[in-house]
């Protein structure tokens, strides 16, 4: 399991590293300024691997562009990052990321909970173009959360699972115990509702281990 610090400002990189993050996610859709300059600033502050993300409005972010526009935005930052988050709607542009030798986090975020059989199909679809499938859903009751835990345990690895919102915030700490590869946290300002800070998550893992 690796801790990802989702940054909403490049100045948070130092805090994330000092608190114990393993990777830094650059949420370009939440940042002001040129993505290349932002990535360079983070490289100057920290040597941790970087994830480039333009989270679409459809999946909880603030990016509204087409796949073609997404490709134009991601191309200049490829020399500076190690991973690229690619939603399914942008999957046909994954070739340029592969050609650059970067790893792909193939992601899907939904405000609903998906049935178990759909989760397994989705995992295969994401793995078809990505190295790490990332599936973030929204359980509405404990039974649905148990299904998500069961999927996480049974799915092919590596896989990343998580929850949207704060209703089942504690699942963010539980899912890595059942095999989720990445745990997304914040380093000052949450990039998503319900995120723990890196420091909080490190403390939780120590208590649960």
Swiss-Prot record:
| Pathway assigned to this chain's UniProt record | Metabolic intermediate biosynthesis; chorismate biosynthesis; chorismate from D-erythrose 4-phosphate and phosphoenolpyruvate: step 3/7
Q: Name one GO biological process term.
A: 3,4-dihydroxybenzoate biosynthetic process
Gene3D superfamilies in alphabetical order: Aldolase class I (3.20.20.70)
Per UniProt, the keywords (alphabetical) are: Amino-acid biosynthesis, Aromatic amino acid biosynthesis, Lyase, Schiff base
GO MF terms here are:
3-dehydroquinate dehydratase activity
Q: Where does 3-dehydroquinate bind?
A: 6, 25-27, 55, 172, 195
Cite the EC number.
Answer: 4.2.1.10
Reaction catalysis annotation: 3-dehydroquinate = 3-dehydroshikimate + H2O
Q: Which residues form the active site?
A: 109 (proton donor/acceptor), 134 (schiff-base intermediate with substrate)
Q: List, alphabetically, the CDD domains matched.
A: DHQase_I
First-tier enzyme category under EC: lyase
Family statement drawn from the similarity comment of this UniProt entry: Belongs to the type-I 3-dehydroquinase family.
Subunit field text: Homodimer.
- Can you say what this protein is called? 3-dehydroquinate dehydratase
Gene symbol of the encoding locus: aroD
